[in-house]
């Protein structure tokens, strides 16, 4: 399937324009969560386990590095930075200067990616390398992990998969930083840390077809016959769990909530213009907590109509349910502001 058909079928070109005034960050933080999670106030007596999610409303290199330094205790050795590097000239991808500043602070680190399932500029390794140059990802090594093959990683406790096919080079790394541009997604409803590794570490031919539940050699032309939304979320969770199980304690997560289009960065220049204001940066060692906190902050924002519609129309909240069922993290979290 060609990229333009993939995006068209996924409904990437439509958006609902939200109206209303901006909400102050203090009010926003006070209102979250609103979708059934538990945000613990600082100073509360904690009962049972909870995760720490660090937050800043300042989206710049200094604060990105600050948050990383709060969660990086377990990072060692050869470090993979899992980043969505985007289609050519994508207007919403993370700023290169921010990523470059952070990468320079992480010894022995490499940006990692995989090729795409759809036939676009990142479908082949050759095209992918050219796209990386166009988008400015030239300041450090970038490893297209499936360029030379695949590897099967086991899924512990999965009900859909026993293994998921990943880019072969993932096993060359000791640790992983999942650096995510949080935004909408055509199929998943939203793209957070879980989506970043669930689809982003799966290889472009076998693994991504597995996660989407389709035949790699015969991608359905009709969007309506692709797997049920809930099944996709569960497949994504199991794929992400395979990566998490592989790295163990040596994987951490950062979500950057800026330029949050309803469309993924795979949409490139045709992505809908964001209507929700930028919110900030989150960091955690817990994948469920950081994605739950990100969703909570989006729901608490007044100008959220198009992004919330995208999440709910794709049953995106089932991503969180699927992670809970697989015991991938904690949806009870303490949101700790560093500002």
What are these regions (language model features)?
Residues 40-339:
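Extended, low-polarity segments enriched in aliphatic/aromatic residues
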Residues 7-28:
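N-terminal export signals
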Residues 36-37:
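Alpha-helical promoter-recognition and RNA polymerase-docking modules of transcription initiation factors
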């Amino acid at each position: 399937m060609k990229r333009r058909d993939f995006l068209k079928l996924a409904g990437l070109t439509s958006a609902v324009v939200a109206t209303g005034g901006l909400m102050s960050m203090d009010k926003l933080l006070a209102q979250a969560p609103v979708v059934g999670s538990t945000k613990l106030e600082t100073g509360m007596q904690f009962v049972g386990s909870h995760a720490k999610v660090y937050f800043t409303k300042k989206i710049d290199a200094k604060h990105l590095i600050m948050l990383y330094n709060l969660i990086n205790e377990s990072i060692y050795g050869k470090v993979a930075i899992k980043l969505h590097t985007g289609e050519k000239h994508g207007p919403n991808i993370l700023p290169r200067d921010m990523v470059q500043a952070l990468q320079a602070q992480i010894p022995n680190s490499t940006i990692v990616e995989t090729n795409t399932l759809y036939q676009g500029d990142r479908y082949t390794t050759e095209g992918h390398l050219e796209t990386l140059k166009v988008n400015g990802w030239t300041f450090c090594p970038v490893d297209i992990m499936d360029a030379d093959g695949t590897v099967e990683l086991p899924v512990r406790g999965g009900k859909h998969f026993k293994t998921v096919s990943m880019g072969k080079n993932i096993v060359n790394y000791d640790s992983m930083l999942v650096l995510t541009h949080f935004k909408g997604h055509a199929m998943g409803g939203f793209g957070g840390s879980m989506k970043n590794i669930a689809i982003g570490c799966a290889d472009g031919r076998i693994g991504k077809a597995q996660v989407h539940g389709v035949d790699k050699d015969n991608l359905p032309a009709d969007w309506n016959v692709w797997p049920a939304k809930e099944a996709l979320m569960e497949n994504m969770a199991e794929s992400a769990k395979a990566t998490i199980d592989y790295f163990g304690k040596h994987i951490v997560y950062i979500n950057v909530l800026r330029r949050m289009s309803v469309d993924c960065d795979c949409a490139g220049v045709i992505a809908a213009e964001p209507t929700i204001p930028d919110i900030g940066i989150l960091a955690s060692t817990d994948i469920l907590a950081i994605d739950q906190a990100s969703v909570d902050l989006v729901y608490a924002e007044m100008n959220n109509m198009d992004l919330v519609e995208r999440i709910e129309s794709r049953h995106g909240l089932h991503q969180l349910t699927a992670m809970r069922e697989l015991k991938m993290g904690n949806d009870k979290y303490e949101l700790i502001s560093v500002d």
